[in-house]
Amino acid sequence: MDSKVTIGLIQAHHDTNGDRPVEEHKAAAIAKHISMIREAKKRGAQIVCLQEIFYGPYFCTEQTAKWYDAVEEIPSGPTTRIMQDLAKELGIVLVVPMYEQEFAGIYYNTAAVIDADGRYLGKYRKHHIPQVQAGPAGCGFWEKYYFRPGNLGYPVFDTAFAKVGVYICYDRHFPEGARALGLHGAEIVLNPSATVAGLSEHLWKLEQPAHAVANGYYVGAINRVGREAPWNMGEFYGQSYLVNPRGEFVAMGSRDHDEIVIGVMDRDVIREVRNTWQFFRDRRPDSYGDLVAQ
């Protein structure tokens, strides 16, 4: 397996007004992202990650049953199958965040992981579900209305190019799962997000570099861009990035443009950092009982 792997992180505006029907949102966003995935492949990407619930707006700023119609089963739903065919055609790994239905009324914020031969490898369900006011009165991250907390643990997927973990948006504020992904062997953790200026921006470039350093892996952080009507809860500030285990930014996107952020993950850097900072060796799990006792 090559030491170096090219990572593609896709950040994009959602171009359809929230008042439009759900299927119109999905069709337009899927077509847009297929085009961007193809461009990422042309630019050398081997692993490509899309933004949180890529085929819709960030609808969690309101609490409206309309958006339950955006759910799909994973992997049997149509979007997973489209992305399996695309991954196989292009020979790339895809991480595809979607709104998942387990069965009627049981819904998750989920990312499917698809290998370079088109095989579905599994999924990660977002663990930490926010309920936080943000932006104008009435707007917020009202995710408990839409999602149950994830129940599949912190899997690491052994893909054709790297061992990949996933941590979705609000998860990034919690170091425990980030550590679990490291202990499970992740070489890179991908964090598809939807977050706005004013609430979390000053944390955006702090928390995930810290996870990368503490766990000796790369982190790919993805955020959408622009403002989404009719809610206008705030500016999705983009700046998707790849950060290495030294805490150095390898690549970073713009604040306000559709963009494919390309960066290189290097296993030699992972090995060098882990051999220098022996954080896994020096852990004291025998003393951490308080973390799960309350």
Where are these regions (language model features)?
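Acidic/histidine-rich helix-loop elements
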Residues: 14-27, 135-137, 142
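Short, glycine-anchored, charge-dense loop/turn motifs used at functional sites
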Residues: 7, 113-121, 243-251
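Active-site catalytic loop in hydrolytic enzyme cores
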Residues: 72, 85, 102-187, 197-210, ...
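A short, N-terminal amphipathic alpha-helix
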Residues: 31-47, 81-89
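Active-site-proximal beta-strand elements of phosphoester/diester hydrolases
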Residues: 4-18, 22, 110, 123, ...
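A conserved C-terminal secondary-structure "cap"
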Residues: 268-294
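Metal-dependent catalytic neighborhoods of phosphoester/phosphodiester hydrolases
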Residues: 53-72, 103-107
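CN hydrolase (nitrilase-like) catalytic-core segments centered on the catalytic cysteine
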Residues: 75-95, 163, 168-260
